[in-house]
Amino acid sequence: MKLILTAEVEHLGAAGDTVEVKDGYGRNYLLPRGLAIVASRGAERQAEEIRRARESKVIRDIEHANELKTALEGLGDVTLSVNAAGDTGKLFGSVTAADVVNAIKKAGGPNLDKRTVQLAKAHIKSVGTHPVTVKLHTGVEAKVSLNVVAQ
């Protein structure tokens, strides 16, 4: 069955792509959920419009991501003060991605989604300087240095 995707489907394609799928997958999953339409001449023209709109949106998103990257890398070291720390420098909890986002915002950085923050480890559990990667878009990442200090 030949279909045109109307939304991004994992492991299949992006909106506007023409794909060949098994009949059952198309009829029972993609079409009822509105993720695809049956390929026809009129639908192919519509798919071309979807592709053009997606390309212009991707260009805008990449430009915005580069602006955010410049703003983040201009911050320098971001300091996060933690109350619960022991004498040995270990935290009585952990620093999560949400804590990092709040620290960046307090340092004058942009407002980010916590899902964009990637920590070197799952959670930071000690004081000191830790590298943090912020994935802003496909291929656009900003490196931020997070300094965790005990109060």
UniProtKB/Swiss-Prot annotation:
Keyword GTP-binding included in the entry's annotation: no
Record field: transmembrane: none
Alphabetically ordered keywords of this record: Ribonucleoprotein, Ribosomal protein, RNA-binding, rRNA-binding
One Pfam family of this chain: Ribosomal_L9_C
GO process terms (BP): translation
Miscellaneous field: Binds 2-aminothiazole antibiotics, which are antitubercular agents.
Role summary: Binds to the 23S rRNA.
Family matches, as NCBIfam families: L9 (TIGR00158)
Protein family (similarity comment): Belongs to the bacterial ribosomal protein bL9 family.
Name the UniProt record assigns to this protein: Large ribosomal subunit protein bL9
Organism: Mycolicibacterium smegmatis (strain ATCC 700084 / mc(2)155) (Mycobacterium smegmatis)
Lineage start: Bacteria, Bacillati, Actinomycetota, Actinomycetes, Mycobacteriales
